[in-house]
Amino acid sequence: VDARAILVAAGDHGVTAQGVSAYPAEVTAQMVANFVAGGAAINVLSRAAGARVVVLDVGVARPIPEGTPDPVRGGRLVTARVRAGTADMTLEPAMTRNEALAAIDAGRRLVAEMRAEPAGLDLLGVGEMGIGNTTAASALSAVFTGAPVDAVTGRGTGIDETRRRRKVAVIEAALALHDPDPADPIGVLADVGGLEIAALVGAIVEAAVARIPVVLDGFISTAAALVACALQPAIAVRTIAAHRSTEPGHRLVLEHLGLSPVVDLDLRLGEASGAAVAIGIVAAAVAIRDGMATFDSAGVAGPA
């Protein structure tokens, strides 16, 4: 697993107009600029994990602030913007079916390109950036697991209980409006998903089909895996859950997919930070498997 990479997909969410997040939507574009400049947590953690970072703008609503890209510490920015953020899912589908497919294809094509690069690709971590995306992830989780919306909806960026209840009501309204059918994963994704989530679906499918292990970051990345596994159930065996976040829906989705997290540290940052931590542990496990002597080969006596 020498060729390690982390893909961070970015996109905005129209549902933020309903007051479901503690942060303004412009934070998405600002954080993408930070990823490229090398100042974010994922930049630091990816270097520690020996992984290169690629940032995919598939649906950021605002222009990325100009800054100074750092070719050493920063991530490489790839722009494949399908649209400037999703629509408000409480009023209309988050995106059209064709837009969902285009975002999936953007993630798929990027992973294919990463595989073809001289550096290659042996292990892929996936994460995201998008204010409002825990709302979309909770909606997807409710549809595919059948769990009540309240059970899969947490505090996201740190909202209080009053706003969390508002978030639950917003998701319930969106699901009542669209009545998404879990037998139609693309339709569900288009109705209540996100552009960056769709891109991660494509990335997960492309890597898994190529037999490349995929390390899922947190709740949103795992929600993307839900969609990917609904499309191709065999994909689950190629995924590794990096951690279990504080979001209640994350635990339920991991159980639904039959995944056990590598670590359980109450992480809630996003941006693939947990995936970077887990990649280091996965690499250590592979090194042990490949390089550590057995008692027999080392001439060590067994139990008396």
Where are these regions (language model features)?
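N-terminal loops that bind phosphate or other acidic moieties
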Residues: 1-304
